[in-house]
């Protein structure tokens, strides 16, 4: 059983970097490395292009992992640099949890049933489970880079792979033949959830890479707050707030002296539109739509007190620079939170 009671979650900055877009430059060497994949799957996105439900699902897994200090509650698997495309060396945790524990971590509401009990169910639970299965089945082109010095010169090691970010195992016991057949047709069937014995999750190496030294802390309810206050918020809002938090964290890590949170962060308007993966609007040069969507992201970030204010420095044609002033008190609350600890009972 995993008791997820932490007020904050920990996320590798390597993983966070995968959420943000960049100008599409699908190079020839990429086609040489993944010829069949690029042709058959038509890769147009590098990294994680997530929908709101996927953000919630990933955060739920991170919340459960955080509760174990990313050690899991089952024996993990050791990877050497030679055995994985990420050149990751260390132990990949494995974590077991029930469907109810996942739905609770996701933020699904309980409803009173005909048996007069509060239970998970309905459309929201279905969306949560579908989002989890998406993360375990949808392959992403994940690129990881590391800088190092070689004979006085900076060089970059680049590793990339095409795979889902979770490996999911689950099981049922005592099914009737009819129930077993029903699962072939509908894997999210809730009618036999009592016979579901839980999930075992093994995360992709990039989720745990340098988790103790290169990470960002977030409120455990960060995405739930967005959904509660702004139920129709677009995926751009989720990406934008993640970008604000991770960028501020990196600036704090790179600052000298007292390592204080920055007063502001800046980015060009066009670069921000690529960061938020607005490629469809960029391709059609729909700058008004882009500006409207970005403005809404900023409004929500201010309402949720991540930002105090925003300035837009105009260029000759399109906006030249976006300046975001952070609400440092909110960030300080996160950095002083001491509730990350192991509260896991190992089976």
UniProtKB/Swiss-Prot annotation:
Organism: Chlamydia psittaci (Chlamydophila psittaci)
Superkingdom field: Bacteria
Protein name: Virulence plasmid protein pGP2-D
Lineage: Bacteria, Pseudomonadati, Chlamydiota, Chlamydiia, Chlamydiales
Keywords linked to the UniProt accession: Plasmid
């Amino acid at each position: 059983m995993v008791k997820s009671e932490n007020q904050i979650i920990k996320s590798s900055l390597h993983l966070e970097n995968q959420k943000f877009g960049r100008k599409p430059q699908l190079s020839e060497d990429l086609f040489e490395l993944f010829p069949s994949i690029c042709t058959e799957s038509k890769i147009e996105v590098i990294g994680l292009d997530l929908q709101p439900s996927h953000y919630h699902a990933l955060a739920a897994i991170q919340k459960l992992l955080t509760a174990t200090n990313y050690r899991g509650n089952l024996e993990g698997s050791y990877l050497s640099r030679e055995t994985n495309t990420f050149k990751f060396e260390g132990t990949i945790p494995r974590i077991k949890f029930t469907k109810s524990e996942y739905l609770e971590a996701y933020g699904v509401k309980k409803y009173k049933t005909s048996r007069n009990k509060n239970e998970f169910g309905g459309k929201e639970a279905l969306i949560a489970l579908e989002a989890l299965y998406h993360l375990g089945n949808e392959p992403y082109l994940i690129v990881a880079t590391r800088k190092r010095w070689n004979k006085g010169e900076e060089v970059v090691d680049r590793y990339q792979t095409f795979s889902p970010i979770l490996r999911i195992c689950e099981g049922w016991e005592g099914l009737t033949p009819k129930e077993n057949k029903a699962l072939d047709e509908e894997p999210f069937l809730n009618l036999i959830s009592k016979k579901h014995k839980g999930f075992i999750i093994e995360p992709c190496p990039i989720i745990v890479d340098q988790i103790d030294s290169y990470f960002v802390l977030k409120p455990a309810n960060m995405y739930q707050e967005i959904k509660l206050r702004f139920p129709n918020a677009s995926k751009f809002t989720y990406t934008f707030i993640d970008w604000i938090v991770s960028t501020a964290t990196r600036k704090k890590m790179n600052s000298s002296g007292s390592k204080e949170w920055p007063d502001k962060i800046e980015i060009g308007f066009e670069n921000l539109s690529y960061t938020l993966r607005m490629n469809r609007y960029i391709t059609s040069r729909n700058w008004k739509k882009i500006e409207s969507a970005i403005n809404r992201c900023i409004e929500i970030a201010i309402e949720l007190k991540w930002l105090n204010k925003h300035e837009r420095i105009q260029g000759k044609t399109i906006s030249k620079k976006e300046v975001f002033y952070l609400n440092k008190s909110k960030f300080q609350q996160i950095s002083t939170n001491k509730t990350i600890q192991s509260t896991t009972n190992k089976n």
